[in-house]
Amino acid sequence: MKELLYTALDVACIIDMEGLSVQEAVLLAQRMHAEDKSFLAMEYRQNYRKWLRDILYWSDYMQDKIALDAEFPSVQAVSDGTMDVSALMRDDFNLDLFFKRLRVQILYFGEQDYARMKLRTLMAKYGYQRRSKDFVRFLKIRFVFYHIQTALRGNEICDVETMDSLDDMITFRVV
């Protein structure tokens, strides 16, 4: 479950995706540290300064990712080939980022206390075409961890495993 906790890199990615200014990013970091401390990686729970510093570091990286990634081969040459550059140049930082971003959007960004999406769209984000048991288990673990409740139109609580149609609109709420 450690991988489900927010890291500074996760928050920097969310900041980049949302196009937040530095001032908005600092406010988000403050609120998350104050209100969602139990969801932060252990190293940040008691150290706001490190939390903010690391978020700003990764945010800076996200702003100029292409140029910095281009420098990695020369860094590896200087390190005598002991550094694994491919691990640092990933574009998919974390598949769980979708759920982390969903929680942040609902709690901190939106005027609404919910988000909506079709199950088919959610599956497409992960490259799934069928509602497999592994995918449903993956979803349920994240829904429970992030306290996300799913409902159909009319606030009818639903289970993604037993929904009739993949094209039903799901409402996500943090409870």
What kind of feature is each model-predicted range?
Residues A41-L97:
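Long, low-complexity, charged/polar intrinsically disordered regions in eukaryotic proteins
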Residues M1-Y6, I14-I15:
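Hydrophobic membrane-targeting and insertion signals
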Residues F109-R130:
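Short glycine-rich, basic-tinged beta-strand/loop micro-motifs
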Residues E35, F39-W58, M123-V160:
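Charge-enriched amphipathic alpha-helical scaffolds
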Residues I14-Q23, A34-E43:
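Charged, low-complexity interaction regions
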Residues L97-D113:
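Short helix->loop/beta-hairpin flanking segments within DNA-binding domains
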Residues E156-V175:
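C-terminal edge-of-domain segments
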Residues E18, N94-R101, R131-S132:
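Structured alpha/beta or helical-core interaction and ligand-binding surfaces enriched in interleaved
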